[in-house]
Design a protein with these regions (language model features):
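Membrane-interface helix starts
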Residues: 13-16, 45-53, 222-236
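Transmembrane helical segments that form the transport core of multi-pass membrane transport proteins
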Residues: 221-272, 280
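Transmembrane helix-loop-helix hairpins in multi-pass inner-membrane proteins
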Residues: 1-41, 92-204, 282, 286-345
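Hydrophobic alpha-helical transmembrane segments
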Residues: 51-55, 82, 86, 123, ...
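Membrane-water interface at transmembrane helix exits
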Residues: 29, 40, 69, 73-77, ...
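Membrane-embedded helical hairpins/re-entrant loop segments and their flanking transmembrane helices
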Residues: 64-94, 252-269
Length: 345
């Protein structure tokens, strides 16, 4: 795997990305303009402690992502520290935004490579972290759906009736991704399909790169999945991360005094919202969440109410997290200059 696969975001790309982020934010604010009075009234009800509680829960997400990275990377580098895992989490969050969704893994690989992990295994482990995340999203939404399917069926109308179809499509994609990592049969099928690519030099180079990545992914997945206790820790941390994220809308709703929805109903709706957002296009993590949130919660809250909750939810889960990740990213760069790469275990 080439060194170009691991890189830091350039200043020019970062500035462009921040301008795009600002433009998208302005568009979202403009779409809320008809309900701005309701939104400001709802936000004004919050106490300082309530705001701090919501922000703290939002920040738990990247911190737990860092813990997941720490547990996964220690399968290769036993000396890998928790602080370094948190650095990887911040690098991923920062890289995802400043490269408009394209650079989370390359930025993480840059850090891991400097920390002593070869690019191939690093890419394999970060891909597996993504697969663990998607698998947990699927399992979480499935459990919530099975436990509350009757309530959901009795309270959904309009476009919400298409949720099962969206669920099925995203579930198929996630299952296929998981099988690509863990099933030798599916990996063999993928190699066979790559043989049908055009015989030009450009496509054959891509084929060689993809085959190399597939081989590394298979090796790392077999190595990691053989360590059952580690896999259970990863799933537990992923589930805890999602649980905190799904608590956010409930806290927003309760603190604003908006809805009779109970805790587990909000857990279900938020898990479905995240699930549906995976099927929608996004730029730097924006667009898909907002659309899915309005779609899912719009059936249970008034328009002004759902926009108020969405505003606070995104401030806590996106904007504050991104601001914190910018600080975390630059701290991670300082850590890199202070460390000596450990030997691979």
């Amino acid at each position: 795997m080439s060194q170009a696969a691991a890189q830091q975001p350039s200043r020019k790309k970062t500035v462009i990305s921040l301008l795009v982020l600002l433009a998208l934010t302005c568009i979202i604010v403009f779409t809320f303009k008809d309900h701005w009075a309701e939104i400001t009234t709802a936000l004004a009800q919050l106490s300082v402690w309530q705001v701090l509680a919501v922000l703290a829960v939002g920040l738990s997400y990247p911190l737990l992502e860092g813990c997941v990275a720490w547990v996964i990377v220690r399968s290769r580098l036993p000396q890998f520290k928790l602080r370094q895992g948190l650095d990887v989490g911040w690098c991923g969050t920062f890289g995802n935004v400043v490269t408009l969704g394209a650079g989370a893994v390359p930025v993480q690989l840059y850090y891991l490579h400097k920390a002593g992990l070869p690019l191939g295994p690093g890419a394999g482990l970060m891909t597996l972290e993504y697969v663990f995340h998607k698998s947990t999203v699927l399992l979480y939404a499935t459990v919530m759906l099975l436990l509350q399917r009757r309530w959901l069926a009795a309270n959904t109308t309009g476009v919400m009736r298409y949720l099962p179809m969206a669920y099925a499509v995203v579930a198929v994609v996630i299952v296929a991704l998981v099988l690509l990592c863990v099933s030798p049969l599916v990996q063999s099928l993928a190699r066979w399909l790559l043989g049908f690519l055009p015989k030009t030099e450009k496509w054959q180079q891509r084929r060689a790169d993809w085959l190399e990545q597939l081989e590394v992914l298979g090796t790392e997945s077999r190595r990691l999945l053989a360590d059952k206790p580690r896999c259970l820790k990863i799933f537990a941390l992923q589930a805890l991360k999602l649980f905190g994220l799904f608590c956010l809308p409930y806290l927003c709703i309760r603190f604003m005094g908006l809805s009779p929805l109970d805790f587990w109903q909000v857990q279900l709706l938020t898990s479905l919202m995240l699930f549906v957002s995976n099927a929608l296009p996004n730029v730097a993590g924006m667009g898909s969440i907002e659309t899915a949130f309005l779609l899912v919660f719009g059936s249970f809250l008034e328009r002004g109410e759902v926009m108020s909750v969405l505003m606070l939810y995104r401030i806590a889960s996106y904007y504050v997290v991104f601001a914190a990740s910018a600080v975390g990213f630059f701290i991670a760069q300082r850590h890199l200059t202070q460390m000596e790469p450990p030997k691979e275990g």
